[in-house]
């Protein structure tokens, strides 16, 4: 048993009907959706049927050309409004030690609508810009209005933390890191595929590959199932070689360097980094990863850098320097004074701050510090 929404897109000669992804029913789910298990049903009593699994907006539908932007925004804002109403309903029911609400509103708006407000974007269309150029501003204003409603209901005796895990930047150019690695002989495709398709890798001959959002793993013998790079000095030499080559990479159309910094994995991540990336490059602002290579494949027959004509016109994944995609952190409540939050607050400071407000000590292994110390 599942739930979904339908929208009649057109009813002319050809009937066009949009259906959202089918979701598990929150009151009779196939598997537990919450802890305690009955909590998902309680939320349904507050707001009715709601999206229960995955991203509560059809970003992928827009990306694949299945969903138009008007339909996307109607469905997305309906979902986000339900989330706010859930929070308001829960606040009215009882006093909570901690209540967390996560809204994707501004994130989604920056991904899909950046090009409509930015004349420098290669996908900018002045005619469509009239309809969509204020969508990012609309997202900020909507979130601000909902925050006002929440604060009004919470009262003055509660501390409120507003935090984003990133900011946003335009994506003018798309780069294909695995194709770049292949061009340098560091990566070898296993198969021949048509241009524009993603090929799997020949791991016996591949020395390095990009996974996820831009991090690079070396195919180290003894660590990877079919490792081809000897640990020790050969491994370090290859890391240095690839890092130097990345920093020397230039966009032939603009002359700009594509990568502005390359760090070793242990410089970025603390704790147990044995399975982490070996290199973490940071792209120049305005560049972003092309799709299709994130699962360790390589795009065939495509330039290493292309103009971004995709619906994904803004982003934060990069990978970028933190200073290029800085987020927002705001504290409000009893005992919080202007200037209490340091100018260089980090995302890893949020958990220690929350623990401090709850009267709990942060574990010794946790990164970051309380912003109220």
PLM region spans:
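Secreted, luminal/periplasmic, and some membrane-associated catalytic domains
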Residues: 1-72, 145-306, 310, 352
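A long, amphipathic alpha-helix that forms part
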Residues: 70-99, 109, 115-161, 166, ...
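Short glycine/proline-enriched loop/turn "hinge" motifs that connect secondary-structure elements
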Residues: 91-92, 206-210, 317-324
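Short acidic, glycine-rich surface-loop motifs adjacent to enzyme active sites
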Residues: 100-104
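Histidine-centered active-site/metal-ligand motif
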Residues: 111, 120-124, 166, 310-317, ...
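Low-complexity, glycine/alanine/valine/leucine- and proline-rich hydrophobic stretches
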Residues: 291-339, 347-349
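Cytosolic regulatory/linker segments at or just downstream of nucleotide-handling modules
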Residues: 364-373
């Amino acid at each position: 048993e599942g739930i979904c929404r339908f929208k009649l897109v057109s009813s002319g000669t050809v009937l066009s009907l949009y259906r959202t992804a089918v979701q598990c029913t929150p009151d009779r789910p196939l598997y537990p959706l919450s802890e305690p298990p009955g909590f998902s049903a309680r939320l349904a009593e507050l707001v009715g049927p709601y999206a229960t699994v995955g991203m509560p907006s059809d970003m992928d539908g827009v990306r694949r050309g299945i969903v138009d932007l008007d339909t996307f925004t109607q469905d997305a804002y309906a979902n986000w409004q339900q989330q706010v109403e859930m929070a308001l309903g829960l606040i009215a029911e009882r006093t909570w030690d901690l209540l967390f609400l996560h809204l994707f509103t501004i994130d989604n708006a920056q991904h899909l609508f950046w090009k409509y407000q930015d004349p420098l974007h290669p996908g900018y269309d002045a005619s469509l810009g009239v309809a969509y150029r204020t969508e990012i501003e609309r997202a900020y204003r909507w979130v601000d209005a909902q925050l006002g409603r929440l604060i009004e209901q919470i009262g003055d005796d509660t501390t409120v933390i507003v935090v984003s895990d990133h900011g946003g930047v335009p994506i003018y150019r798309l780069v294909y890191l695995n194709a770049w690695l292949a061009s340098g002989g560091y990566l070898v495709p296993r198969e021949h595929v048509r241009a524009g398709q993603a090929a799997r890798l020949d791991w016996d001959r591949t020395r390095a590959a990009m996974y996820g959002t831009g991090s690079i793993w070396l195919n180290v013998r003894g660590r990877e199932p079919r490792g081809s790079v000897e640990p020790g000095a050969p491994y370090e030499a290859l890391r240095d070689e690839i890092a130097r080559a990345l920093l020397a990479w230039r966009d032939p159309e603009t002359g700009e360097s594509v990568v502005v910094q390359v760090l070793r994995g242990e410089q970025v991540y603390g704790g147990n980094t044995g399975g982490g990336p070996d290199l973490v490059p940071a792209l120049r602002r305005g560049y972003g990863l092309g799709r299709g290579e994130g699962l360790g494949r390589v795009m065939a027959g495509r330039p290493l850098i292309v103009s971004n004509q995709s619906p994904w016109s803004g982003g934060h994944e990069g990978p970028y320097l933190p200073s290029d995609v800085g987020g927002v952190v705001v504290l409000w409540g009893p005992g919080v004074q202007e200037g209490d939050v340091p100018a260089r607050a980090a995302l890893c400071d949020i958990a220690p701050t929350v623990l401090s407000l709850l009267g709990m000590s942060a574990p010794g292994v946790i990164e970051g510090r309380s912003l109220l110390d």
